[in-house]
Design a protein with these regions (language model features):
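Conserved donor-binding/catalytic core segment of Leloir-type glycosyltransferases
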Residues: 207-223, 229-232, 245-246
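Nucleotide-activated donor-binding/catalytic signature segment of Leloir-type glycosyltransferases, i.e.
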Residues: 249, 257-283
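Acidic donor-binding loop of glycosyltransferase active sites
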Residues: 284-300, 310-313
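Short acidic/histidine- and often glycine-rich active-site loop of Leloir-type glycosyltransferases
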Residues: 306-307, 320-329, 333-334
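Conserved acidic donor-binding segment of nucleotide-sugar-dependent glycosyltransferases
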Residues: 329, 333-341, 347-354
Length: 389
């Protein structure tokens, strides 16, 4: 997979395809074998997010060569005797950060023309709906147009939660006959997990008697950090328990963050780790925490929720999309989205949570979201070229 520094060993996407084909041929996949060989090019490559690493991890074993690309022109003209797929992920960079609608519409048209040409060349188009619209969408009409037109061209639309069709309806329609639903995986086996909860608290200088709420991941306006800080302070005023809030993640917009940072700096029991967290340190934040809070104002699927469960840490999240499905059988609490008091109540409820009981539930829940199982399931669907019956 062309998803990290190892990708440099393949000079081009075509080289990667040839190398992958040779590997599959040795495993009895190919034109002269009982098992068909396929190729899937995915766009764009997300190096900082292990989602793609996990989702494609079992593809070669299922006869599919996964190859990442950040330039569709590099793969558009490739011809292949087996099935070829273009797998689209996040669409935000197609329009980019322009605020000029004419420029945006031109970029949409150029992208769609490229997709049409790839379909003419034999590519099947797959789109994974990670979010309904980009969280920071400026030219919403252009973003909607892009998705409306892309849906028409898709052979497979991949959703990761059952709410996707309903939540999309206000902007665009998703035809059910194109949809396959395979959930977001946990991050099992990806992140190191050797340290104890006690060691993790020691590393982060957290006392054993503190009840710790965690906000983890990139700090962006739509994630509702302002709401969480307010809710934390409100709860702190209602209880005698020693509370602590850990905020760990990279800030995307410093000007938006300035106001809330003043509140954080003025609070002795809020700790801010304002950087991207190295993979080897991720475990410390979740193991030191009692519960992870995702106070998102906009959400569809949440990798952070699954990351939290990977370490056995319960989650609080809004009662929509992936959170609603993930937490329906335990492993945390949901609250009514955009309802501040309900967020406070969910956090208050967590103070008396039976954590041993919830961790047992999480272990059971994680079986459904095992990354090897998810990758194999998705690969089998792709091999069939259609919906999961």
């Amino acid at each position: 997979m062309r998803i990290n520094e190892l990708a440099r060993q393949h000079a081009t996407e075509l080289d990667a395809l040839i190398d992958g084909a040779l590997i599959l041929d040795s495993q009895k996949f190919g034109l002269n074998c009982d098992n068909e060989m396929a190729a899937i090019f995915y766009y764009p490559i997300s190096i900082g997010n292990p989602f793609q690493s996990l989702y494609y991890s079992k593809f070669l074993e299922n006869g599919i060569v996964p190859i990442g690309t950040n330039n569709l022109s590099n793969v558009a003209s490739i011809r292949w005797p087996g099935k070829m797929f273009l797998h689209l992920h996040w669409l935000g960079n197609i329009i980019g950060d322009t605020e000029n609608s004419d420029v945006a519409n031109q970029r949409v048209e150029e992208f769609l023309q490229q997709i049409d040409a790839m379909k003419d060349n034999g590519f099947n188009i797959i789109w994974t709906v990670h979010n309904i619209l980009p969280h920071d969408a400026v030219l919403q009409d252009c973003q909607i147009k892009l998705r409306v037109e892309l849906v028409k061209r898709c052979d497979i639309i991949h959703t990761m939660c059952g709410d996707t069709i309903q939540l999309s309806e206000a902007f665009f329609s998703l035809p059910e006959d194109k949809i396959v639903n395979v959930p977001h995986p946990t991050y099992e086996t990806f992140y190191p997990t050797q340290y104890s909860d006690l060691e993790s608290r020691f590393q982060l200088n957290i006392n054993h008697d503190e009840f710790v709420f965690l906000f983890f991941g990139s700090i962006q306006a739509y994630k509702g950090l302002h709401d969480l800080v307010r809710a934390f302070k409100e709860l702190d005023s209602r209880t005698d328990k020693k509370l602590k809030l850990i905020i760990a993640g990279k800030v995307f917009n410093q000007s938006n963050f300035k106001t809330i940072k003043n509140e954080i700096d003025a609070s002795e029991n809020i700790a801010l780790f304002q950087n991207r967290i190295p993979n080897e340190d991720v475990q410390h934040y979740f193991k030191a925490a009692n519960i992870c809070v995702c106070p998102y104002r906009i959400t569809l699927n949440s990798g952070v929720a699954h990351l939290s469960h990977t370490f056995g840490t319960p989650v609080i999240g809004p009662n929509v999309g992936g959170f609603k499905e993930l937490l329906s059988g335990g492993g945390g609490y949901t609250y009514e989205q955009l309802n501040f008091e309900d967020l406070v109540l969910a956090m208050e409820k967590s103070l008396t949570m039976d954590f041993d009981k919830e961790r047992k539930k999480i272990l059971k829940i994680n079986q459904k979201y095992n990354p090897d199982k998810i990758s194999s399931q998705f690969a089998e669907i792709i091999s069939r070229g259609g919906a999961d019956d």
